[in-house]
Swiss-Prot record:
Source species of the chain: Oryza sativa subsp. indica (Rice)
Disulfide bonds: none
Keyword Calcium: yes
Ranges: Gelsolin-like repeats: 30-107, 147-213, 262-335, 405-475, 527-566
Chain intervals for the UniProt region annotation (Disordered): 739-849
Family: Belongs to the villin/gelsolin family.
Single GO BP term: actin filament severing
The protein's name in its UniProt record: Villin-1
One Pfam family here: Gelsolin
Cellular component GO terms, alphabetical: actin filament bundle; cytoplasm
């Protein structure tokens, strides 16, 4: 390929990493056994290739710059990154990674950590300047990725907010600053394990030291003797430069004209401001983006990259501003969030296109292929469980009989409990289902009553909030067949309808009604009553038309033979003693159209199935009155830490995982967190409906349909203690002697958060500023509820460092207790004022149904 280095030819075809080291103007491929070993005197290019479930390959290009790298190598790396982008069809996202300031995405490729090696790598693979020391000291930060920096072996390198690892000849010490989080301490243990296995061949002692703990601890004495004895650690100093960058709300947009930056004057950023024949720089403080139009030349892109580096250098922000390079059509979520409106991408439906190509190949080879079987859905629950359905009515519930539990009304709300046995354990899956026309009073009651019903069962319970029209496949699997009628039976809904004198469309046994029939093959079938009009038809589906005592079964021209079989089965359910008239699309009799109120236009395009979405994991927490979410890249089971609440985002549904020590005490609190997450708009296509399905999974109760997203180790599921204690027990090979934590969601049947209608929000972000800043966002209503830290805790008169908002342990406010062990306090997601009321509810007698 012209203008592309030969080293890039044929790369990116397989998932994984490809790494090259810059040697002058040449690229030296790094073998896989050496991946993760970076030298401070070199610059590297890293290609990450991931195959999405849609079959599309996603490419991310990073060029890593060591702190001692040559300037000419940095320029070569940026040019080669452009060449690699061209070789891959100009659909990559490029990141400039500076040693010590790497992105979480980059660090996630090299778990447990990367520890840059002093010196450089020559073209003959000889190491220069590799310094071997008897004792080395590392500073560790980060909760889901470890940021490891070698620091001088000195007492002055210690502080209260980080975790430090001191590696000696015979023992590895881990020192936890009193303001470090429990997650950071646990992640630092991964670094300790890495050093033990790679530098000591697995043979060395491990000692953990707590900041301020001296009395009766021989390991602490040995640790401080390394520094010549104990001395107080100075108070932490806040990084004012980074704070200013993070708090600034101003954004600057420039278009690049022959390496000159021309400001674009605007108050709000809109997608229409970006022209395809230009390149732009968007400065957002902590991140600086280069957006390249799809019609720009390669030479223009190289000039723009140079302009970007000049801009960051002139601003003096090489070390604290991350550069991201994008091509039009391949923008990241972080970039889109800075714009007021960003249109939804028109993505080719490769999933269905591939199926059609396979069918064409078989037909060409002489096979009679009328239909390629669809992929059978993956079922992770037993289909032999027991089902119970309750109607929510006037603040209470009524158990439906077996004959009625497969008939729901769209004006009502229901609680569904599906109980089944899995791996010898009892599981209970609760759904709070809200009909499309149900009223807010019943919706709120359904969520509250379901929360109280959890206490009535033994075993593992998972709850879900589901809305009509957005049900997951899991919901329909628990029903053998399901019919959803128009109308309602609850008193609140009937009163609402009577006040409006609007009962048109309610299902009448001998009336006229139209049902759309769908189903999961061989598993379940459903019929949903739709508006009685020809416009409700769709060529991709089959329908049952009830016209008094007569029935029509209508076959859409794009429906499949399996759809026709489902239609016959539903006729036996809906009207078992009636004969129906089979009608194919295009040959309808006049009385068919008369029953529908006349002919009209309807959708005749094939409904294309979206490919399965790739899941993304986010950690959520409150910080200084703000609710924030941050993506966890290359996630695993170990990222489900007990002190946190995490959201597994599968686009069509959310799985809200609640750790025992997260501080979330009720189902309603967890649901509110899910609503805030949906309102933030961090998904690729922006904000999603508030009625997206949300599962609440409590630590220890994980069902198989959740664990299937992980390489699950069930022995870890039963471990006790905080995340640091659990990982330390594994590392030392000792058995735990800890009490079983109380499962808070089983104890609370109400929430102290204000309840909202599922279709409304008390505070929805509408500006880019509210949606931006590294996937962090705020909820104004929740911010008012959060109580800020006491000014006394931040008093400058105190010599001990004050706990950070993310601290799990705090130093005493008394100078006399400087040398005492700081008490470990689990960070609570919600502030104490909210917990007090939630705990008061938890101590009351649970509602029995």
């Amino acid at each position: 390929m012209k203008g592309v280095d030969d080293a890039f030819l044929g790369v990116g075809d397989k998932p994984g990493l490809d790494i090259w080291c810059i040697m002058g103007s040449n690229l030296i491929a790094i073998e896989k056994s050496l991946h993760g070993k970076f030298y401070t005197g070199n610059t590297y290019i890293i290609l990450s290739t991931v195959e999405l479930k849609s079959g599309v390959r996603q490419h991310n290009v990073h060029y890593w710059v060591g702190e001692e790298a040559k300037e000419e190598d940095c320029l070569t790396a940026s040019d080669k990154a452009i060449e690699l982008d061209v070789a891959l069809g100009s659909n990559t996202v490029q990141y400039r990674e500076t040693q010590g300031e790497e992105s979480d995405k980059f660090l996630s490729y090299f778990k447990p950590c990367i520890i840059p090696i002093q010196g450089s790598l020559s073209s003959h693979m000889r190491i220069y300047g590799d310094k071997s020391k008897d004792t080395t000291m590392f500073r560790c930060e980060g909760e889901h990725v470890a940021r490891v920096t070698e620091v001088p072996f000195s007492r002055s390198s210690l502080d209260h907010k980080a975790v430090f690892v001191v590696d000696t000849e015979s023992k590895i010490f881990l020192f936890s600053g009193c303001n470090s989080s429990m997650q950071t301490r646990a992640k630092a243990l991964d670094v300790v394990k890495h050093l033990k296995e790679n530098r000591h061949c697995g043979r060395c002692e491990i000692a953990t030291i707590e900041d301020g703990k001296l009395v009766g601890d021989s390991d602490a004495g040995d640790f401080w003797n390394l520094f010549g004895g104990y001395a107080p650690i100075p108070r932490d100093v806040q990084d004012t430069v980074m704070t200013e960058l993070m708090t600034t709300s101003s954004k600057k947009l420039f278009w690049i004209n022959k390496r000159n930056l021309v400001p674009v004057e605007t108050n709000l950023l809109e997608r229409e401001m970006l022209n395809s024949d230009r390149n732009y720089i968007l400065d957002c403080g902590t991140e600086v983006f280069l957006w390249m139009g799809m019609t720009t030349l390669v030479s223009e892109r190289r000039t723009s990259v140079t302009a970007l580096e000049d801009y960051v250098r002139c601003e003096g922000r090489q070390s604290n501003a991350r550069s991201v390079i994008l091509t039009e059509g391949h923008e990241t979520v972080e970039f889109k969030m800075h714009f007021q409106h960003w249109p939804k991408n028109a993505v080719p439906k490769l999933y269905e296109a591939g199926r059609e190509k396979v069918a064409a190949i078989f037909k060409h080879q002489g096979y009679d292929v009328t239909e390629i079987p669809e992929d059978k859905p993956r079922h992770f629950i037993s289909c032999n469980g027991s089902l119970k359905v309750w109607l929510v009515d006037n603040g209470s519930v009524t158990l439906l009989c077996t004959e009625e539990q497969e008939q729901l009304y769209n004006g009502d709300c229901y609680i569904i409990r599906y109980s089944y046995i899995e791996d010898g354990k009892d599981y209970h899956l609760f759904f709070a289902w809200s009909g499309l026309n149900s009223i807010n009073e019943d919706r709120v009651a359904a969520a509250s009553l379901m929360s109280g019903m959890i206490d009535s069962v033994k075993g593992h319970a998972v709850v879900a909030q589901v809305f009509e029209g957005r049900e997951p496949e899991m919901f329909f699997l628990v029903f053998k067949s399901l019919i959803i009628f128009k109308g309602g039976r609850s008193m609140a809904y009937k009163n609402f309808v009577s006040q409006r004198s609007d009962a048109n469309g309610w299902y009448q046994k001998n009336g006229v009604a139209l049902f759309r029939v769908q189903g999961l093959k061989h598993d379940c079938i459903r019929a949903i009553q739709v508006d009685l009009a020809a416009s409700s038809l769709n060529s991709s589906h089959c329908y049952i038309l009830q016209a008094g005592g007569s029935f029509f079964t209508w076959l859409g021209s794009l429906s499949s033979p399996s759809d026709h079989n489902l239609l016959d089965r539903m006729m036996d359910k809906l009207c078992p003693l009636k004969q129906s008239l089979l009608v194919r699309e295009g040959s309808e009799p006049d009385r068919f159209w008369e029953a529908l109120g006349g002919r009209s236009e309807y959708s005749k395009e094939k409904q294309v199935k979206d490919w399965p979405a790739d899941p993304h994991l986010y950690t959520c927490h409150f910080e200084q009155g703000l609710f924030k979410a941050k993506e966890v890249f290359s996630f695993s089971q170990d990222d489900l830490v007990t002190e946190e609440i995490l959201i597994l985002d599968c686009v069509e549904e959310l799985h809200i995982w609640v750790g025992h020590q997260s501080g979330v005490l009720s189902m309603e609190q967890a649901l509110d967190i899910g609503k805030m997450f949906l309102q933030a708009g961090i998904h690729q296509d922006g904000r999603r409906p508030i009625d997206t399905t949300m599962y609440i999974v409590t630590e220890g109760d994980e069902p198989r349909f959740f664990t299937s997203f992980f390489n699950w180790d069930y022995s870890k599921q039963t471990m006790l203690g905080n995340s640091f204690e659990r990982k330390l027990a594994i590392l030392k090979g000792i058995s735990q002697k800890l009490e079983t934590p109380e499962r808070s969601l089983r104890k609370s049947s109400s929430s102290s958060l204000p309840r909202r209608s599922p279709g409304t929000s008390s505070s929805e972000p509408t500006t880019p500023e509210q949606r931006a800043a590294a996937r962090t966002f705020a909820s104004a209503s929740t911010g008012k509820l959060l109580r800020e830290r006491s000014p006394a805790a931040l008093s400058p008169s105190l010599s001990t460092p004050s706990p950070s908002p993310r601290s799990r342990s705090s130093a005493s406010s008394s100078p006399a207790s400087w040398n005492s062990t700081p008490s470990t306090v689990a960070r609570r997601l919600f502030p104490p004022s909210l917990h007090a009321s939630a705990e008061a509810v938890a101590t009351g007698t649970p509602r029995r149904l």
